[in-house]
């Protein structure tokens, strides 16, 4: 908090109490004693000259007309404080406006347009699965490709995925084929097979049987033929493919677990954490730090002047009293004059004692 206080020497007897309380005022900026009429006090106990309290970056003077922040013993205006210490986008390193919608991934904050996969630049929408690896965002497909390369023993980093992606697929170029004999041409031709498409009911029946017994006997296969209406060859091939897929998946999971165990043992594990993108939220512009609150105090002679204008006082005697208060000569040497003047003044009610006015 910054308080604008009149210097005790300008208050005369009225300033004795604050003088005893504050002691000698030393400026934090220049280190010299403050003799000015006003002291800028920064909460809790930092005191400045009015000419010394300014922004450490842009040298803008800080007073009751602006907000300032204190960090590491330095004072900043609001604009420079937000620029230097405010929250910035983890992708473009640019700050946020109060109207910006942001996406959060752990401790990182992103603009809506910056929330993209670092490999394929696909925009990640709410509900999409992604991972955060080396402070870079990866979509689910690129994260899976990265894990496959890790299981194969290749160096894993998001930048290595670019090399495994086809950059351009060339158009087929027609090539003139030399004439072949008829029997050779017939042997090179492959017979076209019809692809069997299973419906949900057939798949559910086959999966239920597979979970109970991955290797059904001949009797079970005959029952499946009657229940699904598929040929024995299709059922046999489906079970073979299913066992092969499960075996590959089991081997891959073991390799991934072994790789993760080795990474943790060697303190080199950088496994991406799978996350799910949430809905964008409005950025909170509240900056960390205590904003400066400014208070101004009205000089006592000004309060007396306003009181005199609203009451029936002897104007010549009162003007003489005000001149003594302004010049700071209302001390022990002029005590007799003050006594004679104060006898001419009416009693001042307690409600008219000047008090600080907050602005």
From Swiss-Prot:
Presence of keyword Nucleus: yes
Principal location: nucleus
Gene3D superfamilies: Cysteine Rich Protein, Homeodomain-like
GO biological process, one term: axonogenesis
SUPFAM superfamilies per the UniProt record, alphabetical: Glucocorticoid receptor-like (DNA-binding domain), Homeodomain-like
Region (Disordered): 171-190, 326-359
PANTHER family named among the record's database cross-references: INSULIN GENE ENHANCER PROTEIN, INSULIN GENE ENHANCER PROTEIN ISL-2
Protein name, UniProt field: Insulin gene enhancer protein isl-2a
Organism listed in the record: Danio rerio (Zebrafish)
Organism lineage: Eukaryota, Metazoa, Chordata, Craniata, Vertebrata
Gene from which this protein is expressed: isl2a
């Amino acid at each position: 908090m910054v308080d604008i206080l009149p210097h005790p020497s300008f208050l005369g007897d009225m300033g004795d109490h604050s003088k005893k309380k504050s002691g000698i005022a030393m400026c934090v900026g220049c280190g010299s004693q403050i003799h000015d009429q006003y002291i800028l006090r920064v909460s809790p106990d930092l005191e400045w000259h009015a000419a010394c309290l300014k922004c450490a970056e842009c040298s803008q003077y800080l007073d009751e007309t602006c907000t300032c922040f204190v960090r590491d013993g330095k004072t900043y205006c609001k604009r420079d404080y937000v620029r230097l210490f405010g929250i910035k986008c983890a992708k473009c390193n640019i700050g946020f406006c109060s109207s910006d919608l942001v996406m959060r991934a752990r401790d990182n904050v992103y603009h809506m347009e910056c929330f993209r996969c670092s490999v394929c630049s696909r925009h990640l929408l709410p509900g999409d699965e992604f991972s955060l690896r080396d402070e870079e965002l990866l979509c689910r497909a690129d994260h899976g490709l990265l894990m496959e390369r890790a299981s194969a023993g290749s160096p894993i980093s998001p930048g290595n995925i670019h090399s495994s992606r086809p950059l351009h697929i060339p158009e087929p170029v027609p090539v003139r084929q030399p004439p072949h004999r008829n029997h050779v041409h017939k042997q090179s031709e492959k017979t076209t097979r019809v692809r069997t498409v299973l419906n949900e009911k057939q798949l559910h029946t086959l999966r239920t049987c597979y979970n109970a017994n991955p290797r059904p006997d001949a009797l079970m296969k005959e029952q499946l033929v009657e229940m699904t209406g598929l040929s024995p060859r299709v059922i046999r091939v489906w079970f073979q493919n299913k066992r092969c897929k499960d075996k590959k998946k089991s081997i891959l999971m073991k390799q991934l677990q072994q790789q993760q165990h080795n990474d943790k043992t060697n303190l080199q594990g950088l496994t991406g954490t799978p996350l799910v993108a949430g809905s964008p939220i409005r950025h909170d512009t509240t900056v960390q730090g205590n904003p400066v609150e400014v208070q101004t105090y009205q000089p006592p002679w000004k309060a007396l002047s306003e009181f005199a204008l609203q009451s029936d006082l002897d104007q010549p005697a009162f003007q003489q009293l005000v001149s003594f208060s302004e010049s700071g000569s209302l001390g022990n040497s002029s005590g007799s004059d003050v006594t004679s003047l104060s006898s001419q003044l009416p009693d001042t009610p307690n409600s008219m004692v000047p008090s600080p006015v907050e602005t």
